[in-house]
Amino acid sequence: IRCRVNDPFYMNTTSILAIEDGTVVGRIEYHFYGCMQDGYRMTYVDWVYVLPEYRHKGIAQGLFKKMEKDCNKHKMNQYYLIRATNPNADRFYKHFEDVELSECPILRKEIK
């Protein structure tokens, strides 16, 4: 990951780390983008992860709250992510307030 830190391509990405006793125990990564035509501003959450032994302690919720503060600071209209499809993730996201959960198919192609 060090080689990406100074790569201009990744400069619009933000990572917030949860650190306990000097150890990174969780991370959320996101970036902002918008539509020039209508000025709508969105945040895409690329990555959310908390080490298994630190889950169910409010760490992921705290990461999302910090991200939402950053979104408010930058006047973002909404954020979205592609949810993991596992029981733990489903339970976690169902506790969010004022969100729309949907089942959306995803097409992905690796560029070679």
List the predicted regions and their residue ranges:
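Conserved acetyl-CoA-binding loop-helix of GNAT-fold acetyltransferases
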Residues: V50, H56-K69, H95
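Conserved beta-strand-loop-alpha-helix junction that forms the acyl-donor binding cleft
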Residues: Y80-D90, R108-I111
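Conserved GNAT acetyl-CoA-binding A-motif
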Residues: F64, C71-A84
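Conserved beta-strand in the GNAT
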Residues: S15-L17, T23-F32, Y44, Y49
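Residue-level recognition of the GNAT/N-acetyltransferase active site
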Residues: Y33, L51, A84
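Active-site rim helix/loop that mediates acceptor-substrate recognition in acyltransferases
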Residues: I1-S15
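A conserved beta-turn-beta hairpin within the catalytic core of GNAT-like acetyltransferases
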Residues: Y33-V45, R55, L101-E103
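Conserved acetyl-CoA-binding loop of GNAT-fold acetyltransferases
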Residues: Y93-C104
